[in-house]
Regions:
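Short beta-strand/loop motif that positions the catalytic acidic residue
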Residues: 365, 371-373, 377
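Alpha/beta-hydrolase-fold enzymes
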Residues: 2-77, 200, 204, 221-333, ...
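C-terminal catalytic histidine-bearing segment of alpha/beta-hydrolase fold enzymes
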Residues: 401-477
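Gly/Ala-rich beta-loop-alpha elbow adjacent to hydrolase catalytic centers
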Residues: 211-220
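Small-residue-enriched hydrophobic alpha-helices in membranes
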Residues: 616-790
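Short, surface-exposed "cap/lid" segments of acyl-processing enzymes
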Residues: 91-178
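Conserved alpha/beta-hydrolase "acid-adjacent" motif
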Residues: 379-384
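Conserved acidic catalytic loop of the alpha/beta-hydrolase fold
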Residues: 177-182, 189-208
Length: 790
């Protein structure tokens, strides 16, 4: 992808831009706060009326006093139950909080290089039947402070929808404490062993689909890139892949976590925390960072929601809090690798680092990749989920020439956690991904947007219809990145500063910190972490709360809730809304100030001090030729325009006759499958992966040399038998009423006529032999003629 070169922006202009954005952010925050407070005044009758209190109001007041006193006791008792659950969960070893029963398959703690990971098989619930020959699903949850289980938190979850569709489901879990010396490279190796085991258990099934949630997403991509032959399609949900990306504009401040690495001085704080933990990093730090993103929810809303719905809300609250309070640990080597290579350095996918001596090259992945992100996600904004595609492939042509299929699905407003735990998202987006994954494998190489439309049937039932729209990488990258990614330049300064600070810490402070730290001090520090104290203090272990349980039982026996229409409950809700609005106002101002400080420091001051620092965007621009046809991968395909055989000829013909710019409804793939089965005798026996590779090269040829692509078709069909076979297939397809129902465009008719004329004329020139044996004759190829129906 070509990055437009511009003259460097003067520091004063950058400062002016920072000031403009800050001013706009503050105005938006103020306006949002004013509207919320004004809405409270309009919705509360007592705010607009006044009068002498009546007997009715005094009655309501007494009822409200009884109700609020009872709710207070029940609220405190729920927090006590949360504390008891926390201690029970800790005593049980903090097991995974999967809603489903599971069986251990492989425990990596017993591997030659042990890690605290394991593979479990999800036991289908009663009434759910699973077909062992269907594609298995392997779900990887994020190891980001919490324990595993978010992908299978309830029936309406990723696990639930895959089981409901009849697929075997496996889950990658992990244990609270890491094995001594384990690294992320070791974890990647263990996950490879897990996938091989799944394939061994399902020899008649397609390769397993790998589903990665959040940080489990980049783990899934590392797994697939390090051993591309063992995995099926990859689905990554809310997964940060391009860590410098974000939405910097004059609108709302959506991505505050994007700037925290720079404002905290880089990676050295993670090393310090791990050293204070005696070589172990406490995941509670990560959870705390997550909580501070939304102080209104962390400090008030979730507790008021419990208090206001105390008769119905406790079970849901306690279920979520059991997972929220299950904190897991990492080795220092693991957290340092993550922070230095991913969050701050953003250099894993550039080929600067890898595992077991092998660099991670995402272009090695040959199976389709599905990216699911949300505009409402302020932890993994769409830019972070998508920009890696532009960095790794550079252009639409390279995606096609490499035979890759990438599908993007974008939700409008669900938050980060909602991507994984929302029942609505599970029943719609996740369920449809499972349903159409086989069809995604049949897509021609390219970049696609997945669209899910809701349609109501005559009976009022909601059904989902899926279609795919081919997109251009260059257009999508421009839409998501409003400043052509120039706002990522300050992160290069952050990376340089982080390296300096890390070395300074390792030289000047680390030896002392490590000498003063021991297992006892580390454990005391963990137990006194505010996130743990929040969970543990309110429990039966606290002797000052001995009265709470019996009193709560008495309150439940004599519960007298006040009416929801009570003016005092309305006043309570109004006060709560004002408190929430104030905390949101504080958050917006805090985030705006942090953003301004970040860009002023690393976008203005650092470039002035280090003007010769190389720019990643300039490096990318130099690496990508201005003419897409000159890209090495595309050039290789064009140079082989006269090379190939029957499979290449069919793929080229399909490319030449394909409809351009139209959505691809799911029904079209179902028809392709039917046609492929019926005309199997005229199709080459190719696996879908092999067909995509061939189709991708032919796409590049047809895109850049359409006339030569037609003229050289006879060279791919050197024998009269192959030419006759190809023409027979074309004529039979055109005569099929299911195909002719879709009227050909004038361009298609003209192209078809040229193909007929060229093939009818024939050619005595033999096809040039490729360097390797034709892919259709390889013994290891898995016949899948349906794929040839592209």
């Amino acid at each position: 992808m070509v990055v437009r070169q511009e003259t460097p922006t003067l520091p004063i202009e950058r400062s002016r831009k920072v000031a403009q954005v800050l001013q706009r952010r503050v105005e938006i925050a103020q306006d949002r706060f004013n509207k919320r407070v004004a809405k409270v005044g309009q919705s509360w009758p007592l705010a607009t009326t006044a009068g002498v209190p009546s007997l009715t109001s005094w009655t309501e007041w007494s009822q409200y006093l009884v109700d609020t006193a009872q709710r207070s006791v029940l609220f405190l008792d729920t927090l006590r139950q949360r504390g008891n659950n926390y201690h029970e969960h800790q005593a049980a070893g903090t097991p995974p909080l999967l809603h489903f029963e599971w069986e251990m398959v492989l425990d990596a703690r017993g591997f030659a290089q042990p890690v605290n990971y394991a593979l479990v098989r999800i036991v289908p619930p009663e009434g759910v039947k699973v077909d062992a020959t269907r594609r298995p699903y392997v779900i990887i949850d994020p190891r980001a402070g919490h324990g595993p289980g978010i992908g299978g938190f309830k029936d309406d979850s990723q696990v639930g929808v895959a089981l409901a569709a009849g697929h075997p489901v496996y889950f990658v879990i992990f244990f609270p404490e890491p094995q001594p010396g384990q690294t992320l490279s070791d974890v990647c190796t263990a996950e490879q062993a897990f996938v091989r085991k799944v394939r061994e258990l399902h020899p008649k099934s397609p390769k397993p689909a790998i589903v990665g949630n959040c940080q489990g997403g980049w783990a899934a991509m590392m797994l697939a890139a390090s051993d591309p032959e063992i995995t099926g399609p990859i689905v990554i949900n809310g997964a940060p892949m391009s860590y410098w990306g974000g939405a910097w504009s004059e609108g709302e401040g959506d991505n505050p976590m994007r700037y925290s690495g720079g404002l905290l001085g880089g990676s050295w704080l993670a090393s310090l925390s791990a050293d204070m933990g005696h070589g172990v990093f406490d995941g509670a730090h990560l959870v705390s960072n997550f909580a501070t993103l939304n102080p209104a929810n962390a400090l008030w809303e979730k507790y008021y929601n419990l208090y206001s719905k105390i008769d119905t809300e406790p079970p849901r609250f306690l279920e979520f809090e059991r997972w929220w309070g299950g904190f897991y640990l990492m080795n220092r080597e693991e957290i340092e690798w993550i922070v230095q290579n991913l969050f701050v350095g953003d250099k894993v996918w550039s080929g600067a680092t890898g595992a077991n001596g092998k660099l991670f090259d995402l272009r090695e992945i040959r199976m389709p990749i599905v990216l699911f992100a949300s505009m409402g996600d302020n932890i993994t904004p769409p830019q972070q989920a998508f920009n890696w595609v532009a960095d790794v492939y550079g252009s639409t042509d390279e995606i096609k020439a490499r035979g890759q299929v990438i599908v993007g699905l974008l939700h409008e407003d669900v938050g980060h956690l909602g991507i994984f735990v929302s029942g609505k998202v599970a029943k719609k987006e996740h369920a449809q991904i499972v349903e159409v994954l086989q069809s995604i494998e049949l897509l021609p190489p390219g970049l696609y947007g997945m669209k899910i439309d809701e349609v109501k049937t005559a009976g009022g039932k909601v059904e989902y219809r899926v279609s795919f729209v081919e997109r251009q990488l260059e257009e999508i990258a421009a839409q998501l990145n409003r400043f052509e990614r120039k706002d990522e330049e300050p992160f290069e300064a952050v990376a340089a500063m982080s390296e300096f600070n890390q070395k300074a810490y390792e030289m000047l402070a680390q030896p002392t910190v490590q000498a003063l730290s021991n297992e006892s001090s580390a454990e005391i520090g963990r137990q006194l972490h505010p996130m743990r104290l929040e969970q543990s203090v309110m429990s039966d272990r606290n002797p000052w709360l001995a009265w709470l349980g019996p009193m709560a039982a008495a309150v439940r026996a004599a519960r007298q809730p006040a009416a929801e229409s009570s003016q005092f409950k309305q006043a309570e809700r109004a006060a709560s809304e004002c408190i929430s609005a104030s905390l949101d106002y504080y958050r917006d101002l805090r985030d705006a100030a942090s953003e301004a400080q970040f860009f002023q420091t690393f976008g203005v001051m650092f470039p002035a001090l280090h003007p010769a620092q190389p720019k990643r965007a300039e490096t990318r621009a130099k690496a990508q030729p201005s003419d897409a046809s000159q890209h090495p991968t595309v050039r290789e395909a064009l140079d082989a325009i006269e090379q190939g055989g029957y499979a290449e000829a069919l793929a080229r013909t399909a490319c030449l006759l394909a409809r351009k710019g139209e959505p691809l409804p799911l029904a079209r793939f179902e028809l392709k499958g039917q046609l492929a089965r019926e005309y199997a005798d005229l199709l080459p026996p190719l696996a879908a992966q092999e067909w995509r590779a061939i189709r991708g090269r032919q796409e590049a040829i047809c895109r850049h040399e359409p006339d030569r692509a037609i003229e050289t078709l006879p060279k791919l069909l050197a024998s009269a038998e192959d030419r006759a076979r190809c023409l027979t297939l074309l004529e039979r397809l055109l005569a099929d009423p299911r195909v002719s129902a879709a009227r050909a465009t004038p361009t298609q008719r003209a192209t078809l006529q040229r193909i007929r004329e060229v093939l009818a004329a024939g050619s005595t020139a033999p096809a040039r032999k490729r360097g390797k044996a034709k892919v259709r004759t390889r013994a290891q190829a898995t016949p899948r003629r349906a794929a040839a129906a592209h």
